[in-house]
């Protein structure tokens, strides 16, 4: 506004009028105070103007239910700050900006004037990528359920999800150095840990940005939490508990080149300590590309082909497959053509072909990967098993089960669902990817009996700004559309169509275009899948925080067998410089082992020195393992009792659980070898429970 001076005389307006005019200007151009009609604690004291509408009325629920349990939905997998990763130009727009909504919700520079250079958009969406790049205030073409390159996590849209009943959000800090390096547009370097640090800081900045609207530090609804008790307190206040996670392909610099690790145990410890200081409490060890920690679950189709090419460019190796040994399997490997990706291969290098009956990644959890898993357990962090190959996930489960560690999460449907009961039995948490209401409800009902058995809730993983795609519209003429306005699950709020600028979204015709439509999607699930599915989701916050809390309280058991006296039916002897004696199975060194002669009827006996209550025994097999064996205990070395047996061991790390019994002596009695060699055990652990 420009005020010009005139030479003719005019009566000056009264001071009160000037003050009123200035106040009006301040209201138009400055922050917007809370509505006088709805002045509750949940409304900001001063929201920036202009800004997005929330379109929810009513007070967010607080407290607990009659049994002291928190309530609310949990999004176990979102990417609030992915616009800061991948070189800074893959995801266009920001979740907040001090300069306001117009600055936050604008497209990448190269998308102007018509999207011709929106290369990643047409790679992922198809077509030519052309679109109207203008965001605020018109939003003609984005955000959209099928546009993977535009901001969906604007803070006000997240606020709407919170107002609709969500109480926990896991913000996975994400990037990918390979994608960054090959993408045409970037405004920064591609180091993954640099991006993770920046995204963590931006999340804290977003918390401060929201706090400022509510009058100062600690007063906003967006609360970053670093322990489960803090999270429970936030949820009981009716606010949103935000947990930091990490999903990246080369954590701590742990890539592999030509199968040679590029990191050390010291790098892993330093990396875990740094992430913990940043507030990270949940993480993936591998994502998309095989690294020095673990092999991945493959992507399918053209995207899988492109990622396989990316793996070669980064590591010098393509994915390798083998026949699966159990009912679990990795995704069928991508074989569809991806010309733009394949053109980047060096001359003379072509994608390998893969046998149709070989659907498992040959790479599992490496020695460094096992070290990282145990490092996370030591720090009471939660392990995300999605994206791990079947072989890697299986070994990770073995380790978690051997320690009774509950901190395991499957957050967005990238785990073989045959592992579901293993997760629940440990005390872990499962969330399903944000798919269409029909598919999501069907999957929820498929696993409903297991949730009832273990008395747990359910979650969803929106994976917004995670380049995945989201539920499309069911259509305005569907027989049971979402009817606006509708009531929130708790009944305390009324939710209408969401408006930002001049654009109003309707889930029936737009699908899940952005995060603000999460409450609408949940209402769609209620209509399609029934109230029971929504009730399980509403118990999600309690179950997630229970998993987290039990992880924090976990204490490693004392290995009663460590350093004990051991004897055996035999010990292999073929090299005078290698010791395979019985004591090697209880020496605390995972690199040593006891090995028997090459026949079935062999045993290993451990003397604990005194009688103890025993309820759990772990066997860490070398490649020569026992397919069938039994575990016996005795108090006098004469009268033996069988406490556990199997005829179908698959090797690796076996955990035998049984009702606690007094025992001084423990014996592993082999019945049938799985290989032509004898029985070979790296370590035997004996625990009270």
Where are these regions (language model features)?
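Secretory targeting and sorting signals
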Residues: 2-36
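N-terminal hydrophobic targeting/anchoring segments and the immediately downstream early-domain regions
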Residues: 37-362, 367-374, 393-401, 408, ...
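Short polar catalytic/cofactor-binding loops
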Residues: 77-81, 566, 570-573
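Residues that line or immediately flank small-molecule/substrate-binding pockets and catalytic motifs
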Residues: 173, 287, 390, 412, ...
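Catalytic beta/alpha-barrel core
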Residues: 382-388
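Extracellular carbohydrate-recognition regions
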Residues: 557-569, 608
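Aromatic, loop-rich ligand-recognition surfaces of beta-strand-rich domains
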Residues: 573-575, 580, 584-689
